[in-house]
A protein has these predicted regions:
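C-terminal non-catalytic regions of proteins with extracellular/luminal or membrane-system context
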Residues: 1-397
Length: 397
């Protein structure tokens, strides 16, 4: 398998080969599958994606300038309009083969970017998904310990996993191809300047074709509504059906055990909000849990832009044996709940009103909540009264 493709694809800043080397399913022999079933009644599937700051991921794998070599002459891995963060045909065929032969399957996703897991509902045999971002020097040893049950996972998702990435705000706001403004390199995120022709550059791509690029830019029209702040606010406003849109929320993560979190009385004194959370391991395996604290600020239609869910604090427990408890102390400043007013105050503002403070299992599911009331509006617009310890007061440029 390691010799399947010796010239491994590379994604770098100046040139990218997006090929996903994968053995076609028909090359898996009956004996190989039989031997695997004799070894274990559980199977592990690994899906991998590269991607970092060096290059934007393709929103259309068939776009001009995208270098990709299919794994078979019998079919194409991607159809026109399919993107890099969804299954290739070879991967889907492999999953079909594995799930036909195993009733218990774990899928490991090795990649830094949120993958499109909409296919999971089609495979009830896939019992669990493990997100393993770029693992570095020792990460895969840890992965083995988690899979074997020697280590109880306690991580949480650092992004929202959408069911259809093509319908997300960020996908559409950075997709130059969809807007008809794609540069000739054919990747996403590109709106070209119309006065920078003298800065155009050309180079030879992996495919041997000449690739021409020009300076580009992106319109960040989402404002503050990025990631979970968009999904939670959009759901609260009735813009989206959350369950139809989100696969895994921000801050979501499973364990081999179960926990109970109990929220103590919230205190608000001298600009500090504090309370205790008692976490109890209610399962039968030792493990750690994460306390996630969110706030929902008062909002006036047409006023300062605010998200309805905002992560303000989090703490992880020590390793708790079954039945054991730990009380976690939560404390944060009230100016952590301030919002930036770019229209009127042109500064951070902590508006008066009721703020909902909640402990949650992720960005969407509330365990318990209480209210704190800010009596007077505070505007952080002077060097003697800056927001959250800023050296100078933030303001519009």
């Amino acid at each position: 398998y390691t010799d399947y493709r010796k010239d491994r694809p590379m994604v770098a800043m100046w040139s990218q080969d997006w090929t996903l080397p994968e053995v076609p399913a028909k090359q898996y022999s009956d004996k190989l599958i039989s031997d695997a079933k004799d070894f274990s009644d559980e199977a592990v599937i690994t899906i991998t994606r590269v991607g970092g700051e060096g290059a934007d991921l393709p929103t259309n794998m068939k776009a001009k300038g995208i270098t990709y070599n299919n794994n078979s002459k019998d079919y194409e891995d991607f159809k026109d309009g399919e993107h890099f963060l969804q299954l290739s045909q070879t991967e889907r065929d492999m999953i079909d083969l594995v799930t036909k032969n195993f009733k218990k399957v774990t899928l490991v996703y090795n990649g830094a970017n949120a993958f499109q897991f909409d296919f999971l509902s089609q495979y009830p045999q896939i019992k669990s998904v493990l997100w393993c971002p770029p693992a570095g020097q020792t990460g895969f040893s840890a992965l083995g310990e988690v899979l074997a049950g020697d280590v109880n996972p306690s991580g949480k998702t650092s992004d929202t996993f959408a069911k259809d990435l093509t319908k997300t705000a960020v996908f559409n706001n950075t997709d130059g191809t969809a807007a008809g403004n794609a540069s000739s390199v054919g990747t996403n995120g590109k709106f070209t300047y119309d006065n920078a022709d003298d800065l155009t550059a050309s180079y030879m791509g992996f495919s041997g074709d000449k690739v021409t690029v020009t300076p580009t830019f992106v319109n960040y029209v989402e404002g503050i509504y990025v990631g979970y702040k968009f999904y939670e606010t959009a759901a609260d406003e009735g813009l989206i059906n959350y369950d139809d849109t989100v696969m895994f929320p921000f801050g979501y993560g499973l364990s081999y055990t179960t926990f109970k979190q109990e929220m103590g009385k919230v205190s608000y004194k001298n600009g500090k909000i504090s309370f205790d959370v008692t976490v109890t391991n209610t399962g039968d395996k030792a493990g750690k849990d994460v306390v996630e604290v969110y706030y929902n600020p008062p909002y006036t239609d047409g006023g300062i832009e605010k998200a309805s869910k905002n992560l303000v604090a989090f703490e992880k427990t020590k390793k708790l044996e079954p039945g054991a408890s730990q009380t976690v102390k939560i404390e944060f400043d009230d100016d952590d709940m301030a919002s930036y007013d770019q229209k009127d105050a042109k500064a951070y503002v902590l508006e008066q009103g009721d703020y909902d403070i909640s402990i949650q299992s992720d960005s969407h599911h509330v365990i318990d909540h209480q209210k704190v009331t800010v009596k007077d509006t505070v505007t952080y617009n002077s060097d003697s009264n800056t927001h959250n310890g800023d050296a100078v007061a933030a303001t519009n440029e």
